[in-house]
């Protein structure tokens, strides 16, 4: 596993096994942040709720369903691009690559890149970052399919303490 340093931040580490661990803010920090942000945004003249609060487990599942609709083309376009790059990309990579993904979700597109990385190197390190607990499920699924994969995930927003 990588030397991900646990700075003096308010994260709890969960070690699932030698190939999977993830970090997540302590529950009290999440609850306090939610209460503060909702209170602040609903006390403004123009009331709103930050969309990040839509991405709980159910919200993430709903978004994954939306991405497979015929009307939602970005995911299909991205997959098409990645498939076209599948044969050319390895010539630009060396044998010591890590993969960091912001907004990993169910890691559907990630698999296309992992297919390349795992053929190039004996061990692949993957760092998914997602606001939702879906990260844990998708990481466990990836480990079933990629023996040489090691995952260190972060369940948080991009502006979380771990990214400062």
Labelled PLM ranges:
Residues 106-121:
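Conserved SAM-binding loop of SAM-dependent methyltransferases across substrates and taxa
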Residues 2-52, 60:
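N-terminal auxiliary segments of SAM/dcSAM-dependent transferases
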């Amino acid at each position: 596993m990588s030397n991900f340093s646990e700075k003096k931040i308010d994260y709890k580490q969960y070690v699932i096994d030698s190939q999977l661990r993830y970090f997540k803010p302590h529950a009290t920090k999440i609850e306090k942040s939610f209460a503060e942000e909702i209170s602040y945004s609903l006390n403004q003249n123009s009331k709103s709720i930050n969309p990040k609060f839509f991405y709980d487990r159910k919200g993430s599942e709903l978004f994954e369903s939306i991405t497979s609709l015929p009307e939602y083309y970005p995911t299909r376009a991205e997959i098409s691009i990645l498939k076209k790059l599948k044969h050319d990309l390895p010539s630009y990579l060396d044998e010591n690559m890590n993969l960091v993904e912001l907004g990993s979700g169910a890691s559907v597109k990630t698999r296309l890149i992992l297919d390349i990385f795992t053929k190039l190197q004996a061990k692949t390190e993957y760092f998914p970052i997602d606001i939702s607990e879906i990260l844990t499920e998708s990481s466990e699924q990836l480990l079933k399919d990629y023996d040489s994969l090691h995952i260190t995930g972060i369940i948080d927003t991009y502006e979380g303490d771990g990214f400062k």
